[in-house]
Amino acid sequence: MSVASPSLKERLQAVKKTRWIRFGVAAVLFILFAVWLDNYYILPFLVVMADIYLTRYVPWTFWKKSKNKTVLRVMEWVDAIVYALVAVYLINIFFFQNYKIPTSSLEKSLLVGDYLFVSKLSYGPRVPNTPLSFPLVQNTFPILNVKSYIEWPSWPYHRLAGLGKVKRGDIVVFNFPAGDTVAVRVPNPDYYTLVHYVGRDGVKRNKEQFGEVVYRPVDRRENYVKRCVGMPGDTFEIRDNQVYVDGKAIENPRNIQFNYFVMLQPGYRFSEKQFRELGVSVDDRRFVSAERGWYEDLLALGFMPDSDGAFPSIYHMPLTPEALNRVKKYPYVSKIVQEPGAFGGEAYPLGYGRGWTRADFGPLWIPKRGETVRLTAENYLLYERAIRDHEGNRLERRDGRIFINGEEADSYRFKMDYYMMLGDNRDNSA
């Protein structure tokens, strides 16, 4: 004999007061979340929430009625794992995320291996471009070496309202802009630098060295952490390693570092204790006098070998102003030379031909939302990637003329704000 299913009225009358309260709190939070997200298409999910908390037409926890202890145990674990993954996914996207510092670009402020809890609410969380992804993995499953995300569906760029805006001097975690295309075996230097020096065909043909060339959506590009030094609308420039904004020198971070070559008198070497006192990590120091590849560079920098053609102890390492002053006081230090900016190779944009280096760069106007820049043959390379890759336009040059989305253009109005980021460890920052 079948038992009639309770009516909707009977189901609602049977709901305990505590469940009504829990549903009310959850519903209000969900509605506020939809407003914040500016996406009202998710509101029908309230019907599902009402069934979970109140009506229970769908047996969401059917497995709890099983008399099989193994089924109960397994399903409890599955339930807990699914709940945890969904919670971590939502927390990482909209509230805060854990990051590990991979390089020494902010050495002294943030050390290699440090773990950061980064607030997504500070500047407003970005809605994911690839919503179907596995939590806790950026773009590739370790060991398996396969993508940790699915490219469909793909959502356009959209950032939610936050508690504030980026300010000069802020330390910011962001997705590396030039990481849209990657040679998987050589992710650093970036693909565009490899193409500049090796050629596009050279990278694609030599898969043993460079691996497959893959495209990554914005939210799946590698995470970088730097300090903001240039704001939208600023005219940014570096002169002799000093940053200028709109023609005025800005205050340097307290622990700013530059690379130096330090030569000691014959018979002397730095001890581990001295390196620790100077704050120089093992990864950041090199004993270059023993490396053949440095011979010509050392001669060009003014270091002189002995009669046998050998150099005394010469170290290459980053130093803060405080550490540099300490080294200058060592009686057995015979010469200190700051690494020239040219040692870092060409600066952005590659192929610009103006001789810009990391020590002498610009001036460069940083694009600002709503502002217009006049496009010329001279500044085309400066704004090419921003207009084409970051703002989604079809940009090309034909017969000395510039075309945007098929129409000839002599100017462009930017849709987004742009920022200039630098590491405090200036000469060891990608």
Q: Which stretches of residues belong to each language-model region?
A:
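Extended hydrophobic leader/signal-anchor segments used for secretion and membrane insertion
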Residues: 1-430
